Amino acid sequence: IDIPIVFDADTGYGSEANTAYAARLLEEADMGAICIEDKMFPKQSSLLPGGAHPLVSIDEFSGKIAAAKSAERTGDMVVIARTEALIAGLGIDEALRRAEAYEKAGADMILFHSKSKTPDEIVECVKRWNGKAPVTLVPTNYPDLNEPAMEAMGKVRMVIYGNQTVRAAVKAVEEVLHEIRQSRGARAIEDRIAPVNHVFALQGEKMPERV
């Protein structure tokens, strides 16, 4: 396909060797970028209330970034280093310290992740970032920070909408199922759901017009 794909590689799947192997396979699969985070493996979701978010050492994660870059054959795949220092409550200084080390290890982009309900923390972090690597943001918990505001920072080059489509789908499914149960039939929701033809078209298949 023509649209670049960003692959979430979690923590790199274990050791440096695992990370390098995954990076090689993902490059061969024509991924546009892979994102690796500095949490310990296995990990919990960054947004899980009360979740534990221990991080690996800077040296260990820098090794994973270097391994991912060295595994590339074409050099066309972008490696995004995601630091969870803000998620872990370690503060902006630690997030910046880690980002600097990851850039030195070869990261093409830096992702600062925050679960703060306001954009203040992430805005301050980006403002203080002095590295050359551009920044990626994930405005899941701080939706008030829009793209024009990010562009104005001059350092943000990618925005990842990590779960908005999943949450939209969940809400739509719940509403449709509720309507079916209330009306005891599917007629009431027919104009709110995608035609079967459209579903198959998304898969590159064709269906007779009558379906």
Question: How should these model regions be labeled?
Answer:
Residues I1-T140, L145-I160, A168-E174, H178:
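Alpha/beta enzyme core
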Residues S70, T165-V211:
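Extended, intrinsically disordered, low-complexity segments
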